[in-house]
Amino acid sequence: MTIRRRDILLGSGAGLTALAVTETGTAESGCASFSAHRSTYVLVHGTWHGGWVWQEVADRLRAAGHRVYTPTCTGCGERFHLTGPEVGLDTHITDIMQVLECEDLDNVILVGHSFSGTTITGVADRLRERIQRIVFFDALVPREGRMSGIARDPDTGDFPKWWKEREKQFIDGYQMDLWQDYPMEMLVPDTFPEVAAKLRRLITPHPAKQWTDELVLADGGWQGLNPTYIHCVGQAYRKSSDLMVGPARGPDWKFIELDIPRDGMLTHPTLVATTLNALSNVR
């Protein structure tokens, strides 16, 4: 099932109020009339980000009565000082598991951005009894043959040449620097200068092992957990390809398209919050 922005704003009986989304260079403002169903969300950031990237969306969901957690994984954001060469995918999976277990969260709508798709899949595999729905926000969907952020040669197990070249530029040999490899347009277009300024202030290097570690599943990962994909089709520079989307266009998935950039939670927080809120009404 593919859902587009218009369907979300119409609400389909979910009690949502349509909002005008500005695209003039500033992030949108305003509030939505959400439905009364109370859900628990755990919003997981992607590469180079921290929990801060979800704050505007979280504020809107909380205003609607939902419980929302925006944890920051080890070695990222305000926890950047805890980084080290040993920090990898399993570290980040454990970070998020600890939130679910220590906060005693159940019926969680677990959302992951970008390459945290592997992280949330690992969490879902180990704590599937706590997950109501898993949501990939323009994220990598792990599956057989692609269980890490970097696809290895299937015959030799080697990393691709482009990755080996990038490794030479890593900070201290293990941290990926966004600005070394990509322009701001990787995250948002130049029509959002305020958001870009925020990103320049808050972006931190990212532990490369979170990309390169292979995810090992024992209990099906995202399968059977109402998997949902939100595709940011407004991304112009290096749009997420089908290599990221993988099986998410299949019949067992809910597939949503939003005309927003990769960091759409910053440029269009109300639309993203409205979209996530609508998922709380779907069983």
Where are these regions (language model features)?
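Conserved hydrolase catalytic core segment
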Residues: I109-E144
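C-terminal segment of N-terminal export signals and the immediately downstream linker at the start
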Residues: T22-V42
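Conserved HGGG/HGGXW glycine-rich cap/lid loop of the alpha/beta-hydrolase fold
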Residues: S39-E78
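N-terminal export signals
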Residues: D7-S29
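Catalytic active-site module of serine/aspartate enzymes centered on a nucleophile-bearing elbow/loop
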Residues: I256-R283
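Active-site loop/oxyanion-hole signature of alpha/beta-hydrolase fold enzymes
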Residues: C73-V108, D125-R126, A151-D153, D158
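Flexible "cap/lid" loop of the alpha/beta hydrolase fold
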Residues: F136-F170
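Conserved loop-alpha-helix segment in the C-terminal half of the alpha/beta-hydrolase fold
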Residues: V233-D259, D263-L266
